[in-house]
Curated annotation (Swiss-Prot):
Positively regulates the activity of the minus-end directed microtubule motor protein dynein. May enhance dynein-mediated microtubule sliding by targeting dynein to the microtubule plus end. Required for nuclear migration during vegetative growth as well as development. Required for retrograde early endosome (EE) transport from the hyphal tip. Required for localization of dynein to the mitotic spindle poles. Recruits additional proteins to the dynein complex at SPBs. It comes from Paracoccidioides brasiliensis (strain Pb03). Gene3D superfamilies: 1.20.960.30, YVTN repeat-like/Quinoprotein amine dehydrogenase. SUPFAM superfamilies: Lissencephaly-1 protein (Lis-1, PAF-AH alpha) N-terminal domain, WD40 repeat-like. Residues 9-41 form the LisH domain. This is Nuclear distribution protein PAC1. One of its GO terms (biological process) is establishment of mitotic spindle orientation. It comes from the Eukaryota. Keywords: Cell cycle, Cell division, Coiled coil, Cytoplasm, Cytoskeleton, Microtubule, Mitosis, Repeat, Transport, WD repeat. Residues 60-87 form a coiled coil. The gene is PAC1.
Length: 478
């Protein structure tokens, strides 16, 4: 008898082995084992039924435990490597200062439910809800804190290409766009009911973004939405009426991406024509064009005011633009594998080289010091704007396939009652009169009474999400 097992354990194992052989239709082998064990195991047919499947369960349990051990060892090695390369001073500073936080492996959560590639992700401005869209035509709503799927939204008939939360104050909506040529608006406060469908584009709608309130003093402030399409146009919509209020023309090929400036005054777009354009929302005119990429431009981003001092220094300026100004610096990512940083006039400041495949999405760190990028090379890269845009961290194999998107959770403004244009008092009343823990999880105060622009103190949520052709969404969080 094995010294590793007690007599009782050995008997249970033998019964499970015989039951397995019988269930596998191997009666001769089962009989041979019974004969070999002689009288040490009493197992009639009725008792054998109780042991069916037991061996398989134990086997799969062992496999799961082995996988858990390997995952924990991998996580431990990654953390140990990070610890070994850090000094006590840098560790203390990182623990205290969210401005220096960067994502690292392993991800906090791996969210799996989509049946085809994940194309887009978007964070709710207040609560711990994360939306993801996919080629499988669905939108899925996750709780990124718990790593759980909350619901699946169906309505589009082709691939969902982008999602974004925003809208009027106190009335956050989710917008989605699709290859089915439509944009749809969903109400999170009413079970994500589809409240409006916006037709009008003549081809796939590639990107959709809410325009923050205060767009050039427009009476429609807070109600505007912009979309980009393969039909070569941008369209601005009034979400309360569903009407297209403006069509912007200038691109001569598929418009891949569009974003709005933080104050809603400007739009930045780019596409297959290898050109990026800065637009004035109120006039609908192109303010600047950005030329230099050698392939389609996949993604664009506005630099936050917190990055102005670093980018001004990079541009050789002695004084940074005021943080109250809008759209001073922008970034573009391209299929030519490069990232380019520009000023608002279209002057190239810096070209970032390092990715080995198409650059698919960009996100500036809200603290202003870093730019994050993801690529078809399966990596997530962090570029330090204070070190000549040096790549200071690479999360290798962040996904198992091409990475299609990245979003940083929006900041929470601590004392203004407004969260990125959303009235938190409404959200609080819907949650029993006060913001629950999930509404503020992941928030780390900056430690400053005011932001650089003189506004209210903001809390940086050290949370990002990425999506991939590997069908998964990954959440990286502090």
């Amino acid at each position: 008898m094995s010294q590793l097992l007690t007599a009782r354990q050995a008997e249970e194992l033998h019964k499970a082995m015989i039951a397995y052989l019988l269930s596998a239709n191997l009666p001769k082998s089962a009989a041979a084992l019974r004969e070999e064990l002689a009288d040490s195991v009493q197992l009639d047919d009725s008792t054998a039924k109780k042991y069916e499947g037991l061996l398989e369960k134990k086997w799969t349990s062992v496999v799961r435990l082995q996988k858990k051990i390997m995952d924990l060892e991998s996580r431990n090695n990654a953390l140990q490597s990070e610890l070994d390369s850090a000094t006590p001073t840098s560790l203390a500073r990182r623990n205290q200062d969210p401005v220096s936080w960067l994502p690292h492996a392993p991800a906090r959560h791996i969210l799996q439910s989509h049946r085809e590639p994940v194309t887009c992700v978007g964070f709710h401005p207040v609560f711990s809800s994360l939306a993801s869209g996919s080629d499988d035509t669905t939108i899925k709503i996750w709780d990124w804190e718990l790593g759980e799927l909350e619901r699946t939204i169906k309505g589009h008939t082709k691939a969902v290409l982008d999602v974004d939360y925003g809208g009027p104050r106190g009335g956050t909506l989710l917008a989605s766009c699709s290859s089915d040529l439509t944009i749809k608006l969903w109400d999170p406060s009413d079970g994500y009911k589809n409240i409006r469908t916006l037709p009008g584009h003549d081809h796939s709608v590639s990107a959709v973004r809410f325009i923050p309130s205060g767009a050039a003093g427009s009476p429609l402030s807070g109600n505007l939405l912009v979309s980009a399409s393969r039909d070569k146009t941008l369209r601005i919509w009034d979400v309360t009426t569903g009407y297209c209020v403006k069509t912007l023309r200038g691109h001569v090929d598929w418009v891949r991406d569009v974003v709005a400036s933080p104050d809603g005054r400007f739009l930045f777009s780019a596409g297959n024509d290898q050109v990026a354009r800065l637009w004035d929302v109120s006039s609908g005119e192109t303010k600047s064009t950005f030329l230099g990429h050698e392939h389609a431009v996949e993604c664009v981003a506005f630099a936050p005011p917190t990055s102005y001092p670093h980018l001004a220094a990079l541009a050789g300026l002695k004084k940074a633009p005021p943080s109250s100004s809008s759209a001073e610096y922008v970034a573009t990512g391209s299929r030519d594998k490069s990232i380019r940083i520009w000023d608002a006039r279209g002057t190239l400041i810096k070209t970032l080289i390092g990715h080995d495949n198409w650059v698919r999405a960009l996100a500036f760190h809200p603290g202003g010091k870093y730019l994050l990028s993801v690529s078809d090379d399966k990596t997530l890269r962090c570029w330090d704007l204070t070190q000549e845009c040096k790549c200071v961290r690479t999360v290798k194999d962040a996904h198992g396939h091409f990475i299609s998107c990245i979003r940083w959770a929006p900041n929470i403004i601590k004392d203004a009652g407004v969260v990125n244009g959303d009235d938190t008092s409404t959200a609080a009343s819907a949650n029993g009169g006060a913001l629950g823990a999930s509404a503020i999880n992941g928030v780390v105060p900056t430690g400053k009474k005011e932001d650089p622009g003189g506004g209210p103190m903001m809390g940086i949520r050290c949370v990002i999400a990425t999506g991939s052709v590997d069908l998964k969404v990954r959440v990286f969080a502090s």
